[in-house]
A protein has these predicted regions:
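Extended, charge-rich low-complexity interaction segments
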Residues: 170-188
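Conserved catalytic-core segment of NTP-binding enzymes
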Residues: 55-154
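A short, charged, Gly/Pro-tolerant segment at domain boundaries
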Residues: 191-214
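P-loop/Walker-type NTP enzyme "switch/lid" segment
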Residues: 1-51, 151-161
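C-terminal helical "lid" subdomain and adjoining coupling/linker elements of P-loop NTPases
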Residues: 164, 187-194
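Conserved phosphate/pyrophosphate-binding and hydrolysis machinery centered on Walker-type P-loop NTPases
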Residues: 36, 61-62, 68, 118, ...
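C-terminal boundary of histidine-terminating zinc-finger modules
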Residues: 156-175
Length: 214
């Protein structure tokens, strides 16, 4: 798509309930961490969908690569997903620290993933909150938990969405709750639409990213 060899609609996979998925660039070197010079092509590609999407959800990799940072600082909402592992907590803190100190992002939502009990998710959030309160000037909001659930693994094996394969599973219930939360999050203002807001922020990120590498 970025090379102009096909249109975005040629690679989109249609999912249930109007969900559209743009598959990740598995095994393609350089696609997971696009340089700022490629943002224009990305924006043009997604511009084809500007009249069709209610929500644009970007699932980035873990860590603080330039690609991750570019998408995160352009997003209206940053949802940090953490699990109870030292590497996950370190990645989450590093992302929050860089976005807050270098790009002025001051509010983050935190989702605890693969926890055994809701209380464990709250405790995980409290640990991250304590560190951020001590060293950073940011606001963290608890977005909930997604429990460890064997049904999720089974859904992956079946190559089916969890909410279709096992709609009554604990993880499916948690994801439904999260989706209902997202619907209540405030909408972007100052742009003619949700995608336009995101694209404006992406364009603003180009000189910032270029300046950081000079």
């Amino acid at each position: 798509v970025l090379a102009g060899e096909c249109e975005l609609e040629d690679v989109i996979v249609a999912g249930p309930a109007g969900l559209l998925v743009v598959p990740a660039a598995s095994g393609v070197a350089g696609m997971a961490d696009l340089p700022p010079s490629a943002y224009g092509g990305l924006i043009n590609a997604f511009g084809q969908l500007s009249g069709e999407l209610d929500v644009l959800l970007v699932d980035t990799a873990a860590g603080v690569s330039e690609g991750v940072m570019s998408f995160a600082r352009a997003a209206q909402e940053v949802l940090v997903v953490v699990c109870d592992e030292p590497a996950s907590m370190a990645d989450a803190y590093a992302l929050i620290k860089l976005l807050s100190r270098q790009h002025g992002v001051s509010r983050f939502r935190v989702l605890a993933n693969m926890v055994r009990r809701s209380r464990d998710g709250r405790e995980l959030f409290a640990k991250l909150l304590a560190v951020c309160d001590q060293y950073l000037d940011v606001v963290l909001e608890f977005a909930g938990v997604v429990p460890f659930d064997d049904y999720l693994r089974k859904a992956v094996q079946r190559r089916q969405p969890l909410l279709e394969a096992f709609p009554r599973s604990p993880a499916a219930f948690a994801l439904r709750q999260l989706a209902e939360q997202v619907e209540r999050w405030p909408r972007a203002c100052g742009a003619s639409g949700h995608l336009e807001f995101f694209f404006e922020r992406m364009l603003q990120a180009i000189p910032a990213a270029a300046g950081g590498t000079a």
